[in-house]
Amino acid sequence: RVFEETLPVIANPPSNWKHITGTHVWRAHGAGNREGDKRYWANVHRHGIRKVVVTDHETMWRDGGESFTFRTRTAPGKGGDESAREYSRFMQDTLGFVYGPYNNFTDFAPVNEYWTTDLISRDPQNQLQHAWMRCYAPKPARAVEYCERLSPINQAKFGFSTAYCDVHTAVAPWDRVDYDPRVPGAGTLAAVFYSYGEIMLLQKKAWNGPVYSEGNNHAFYCGLTDGNYGQDQRYRPAENPWLVDFDLRRIHDLCCNFGMGNPDMFYASVPQPQST
């Protein structure tokens, strides 16, 4: 039997944003000092680098340890909404870049204005399910609801043209199963997959542009996402032989993933080389 015939088929529609993701350089650039950020990107533009997709990171929403997801108001210490709106216009209208926010519907902090325990998934012991540090895992079904509710508000405020939707493709669907018997699809990974897939489609609709995510388990979502970090840390690619057939024959036709991300995504469990 031919090896490639055994590869699973990803039954998602191809991305309709490959003309952007495939022709532009992608960069995650978390908000710091907005005037300094503008000088940095103006210098990039001055050097002739024009086809660029820039997605902000969670620092656009927080100044310290406050909530960074399920937000419609940006970090006050960075100038708040007025500064974020002006920066969005500078990146897109002045420089001609594709620019958008960080968002995430997988991590939810108790200090968030929308917080309620009824939004949080339950584990098999019926306890609140933990997620990222200081966060709990939102119910996938409710995550869809809030994506559909909040994304248009942010788009009306800031006029983005892309977004980074963190974590959704980093975790496996079976790692975020909601065991709350009150929800449809309780105890099933399918409920997670369909919810996260719908979130990606809602993202594209909201920004009228490509949506990116974190990768590692992105094969399930390619096509629904337009790009991801092309990483597979659990395989430990710095230590094991590369079998690229699945990536090239199944994933590449659906979306445009980028590189290996940060070097520690490639050197997942071994020290990075200090010289070349």
Describe the residue ranges of each PLM region.
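The substrate-binding groove and active-site-proximal loops of carbohydrate-active enzymes
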Residues: 19-34, 66-81, 129-148, 178-192
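Active-site neighborhood of glycoside hydrolase catalytic domains
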Residues: 139-214, 219
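Active-site clefts of carbohydrate-active enzymes
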Residues: 130-132, 169-182, 222-223, 267-270, ...
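Generic structural signal for well-ordered alpha-helices
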Residues: 37-42, 84-89, 147, 151, ...
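Active-site-adjacent "subsite" loops/lids of carbohydrate-active enzymes
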Residues: 89, 97-154, 240-249, 255-258
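Carbohydrate-recognition beta-sandwich/jelly-roll modules
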Residues: 1-66, 72-78, 90-99, 103-105, ...
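Substrate-binding cleft/loops of secretory-pathway carbohydrate-active enzymes
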Residues: 64-68, 108-122, 172-177, 212-265
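Active-site-proximal helices and loops of the catalytic beta/alpha 8
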Residues: 57, 88-90, 97-100, 192-235, ...
